[in-house]
Amino acid sequence: MKIKIQKIHPNALIPKYQTDGSSGFDLHAVEEVMIKPHSVGLVKIGICLSLEVGYELQVRTRSGLALNHQVMVLNSPGTVDNDYRGEIKVILANLSDKDFKVQVGDRIAQGVVQKTYKAEFIECEQLDETSRGSGGFGSTGVSKA
């Protein structure tokens, strides 16, 4: 699949996969952003893109940022629809007790291209019964780890 990329900032970098087996590609910050402890920041990526119909871009947390800095993509996975043409931006949440400084060029998130499906919604009077029923949070048991 080919994805058209438009750089709209001089510091923007074209995404690339780090290894042949990578599912995700890195998204790089184009400006410095300071994210205070227990706060969120909006980080610009400096690119716009055009996805094929039937695909979305999921913006996900980088595991190293989560483990080492307690920084994550707040709405992970964030969805970039195939008809969106604006700048890609990432909402980062700093869950730590320290300031987190994003530098120009930092890899702050990863993108994964995913196939999407359109569902047809059919209104009905009653749903089929299941053994779970309407049991929600924790209804199938809690781990005793």
UniProtKB/Swiss-Prot annotation:
Molecular function as annotated in GO: dUTP diphosphatase activity; magnesium ion binding
Gene3D superfamilies xrefs: 2.70.40.10
EC numbers: 3.6.1.23
Keyword Hydrolase: yes
Keyword Secreted: no
Reaction catalysis annotation: dUTP + H2O = dUMP + diphosphate + H(+)
Intrachain S-S bonds: none
InterPro entries attached to this UniProt entry: dUTPase, dUTPase-like, dUTPase-like_sf, dUTPase_trimeric
Cofactors demanded by this protein: Mg(2+)
Biological process, per Gene Ontology: dUMP biosynthetic process; dUTP catabolic process
Keyword list, A-Z: Hydrolase, Magnesium, Metal-binding, Nucleotide metabolism
Amino-acid positions noted as binding substrate in the UniProt annotation, renumbered to this chain: R62, S63, G64, N75, T79, V80, D81, K89
Pathway: Pyrimidine metabolism; dUMP biosynthesis; dUMP from dCTP (dUTP route): step 2/2
Top-level EC class as recorded in UniProt: hydrolase
Family classification: Belongs to the dUTPase family.
NCBIfam families: dut, PRK00601.1
Task performed by this protein: This enzyme is involved in nucleotide metabolism: it produces dUMP, the immediate precursor of thymidine nucleotides and it decreases the intracellular concentration of dUTP so that uracil cannot be incorporated into DNA.
Protein name: Deoxyuridine 5'-triphosphate nucleotidohydrolase
Organism annotation: Helicobacter pylori (strain ATCC 700392 / 26695) (Campylobacter pylori)
Gene name of the record: dut
